[in-house]
Amino acid sequence: MRIKRGFKARHRRKKILKLAKGFRGGHSKLFKTAKNTVDKALGYAYRDRKQRKRDFRRLWIARINAAVRMHSLSYSRFMHGLKKAGVELDRKVLAELAISDPSGFSKVVAVAAEQQ
């Protein structure tokens, strides 16, 4: 007895077209172009999830560096001083502290500076 494929192909196409919703023109209507576009989009999303972590780290370092240089200390000396002092604040917290609470950040800088 012959077994037909049934709804499998339709479900596969509908899944791709659902993912392509919001794309412009044929990229959201035509299966072939939608499949290519969705493949690209998923690849970009995967790549940029990794990239976002690197971007934020660069941003935090730039912010910490700018704030530390106002206290006449370099970023690397500041981080080394923190490590020697046993202060375990990460870059995200330090960058937020530098922006939202400059007086508190200056105390952290003082702790790092006295380790030099």
UniProtKB/Swiss-Prot annotation:
Example of a GO cellular component annotation carried by this entry: ribosome
GO molecular-function terms, A-Z: rRNA binding; structural constituent of ribosome
Superkingdom, natural source: Bacteria
Signal peptide: none
Cross-referenced InterPro entries: Ribosomal_bL20, RIBOSOMAL_L20_CS, Ribosomal_protein_bL20_C
GO BP term (any one): ribosomal large subunit assembly
Disulphide bond pairs: none
SUPFAM superfamilies hit by this protein: Ribosomal protein L20
UniProt keyword list: Ribonucleoprotein, Ribosomal protein, RNA-binding, rRNA-binding
Family designation: Belongs to the bacterial ribosomal protein bL20 family.
Summary of the function given for this chain in its UniProt record: Binds directly to 23S ribosomal RNA and is necessary for the in vitro assembly process of the 50S ribosomal subunit. It is not involved in the protein synthesizing functions of that subunit.
NCBIfam families: rplT_bact (TIGR01032)
Name of the protein in question: Large ribosomal subunit protein bL20
Species the sequence originates in: Desulfosudis oleivorans (strain DSM 6200 / JCM 39069 / Hxd3) (Desulfococcus oleovorans)
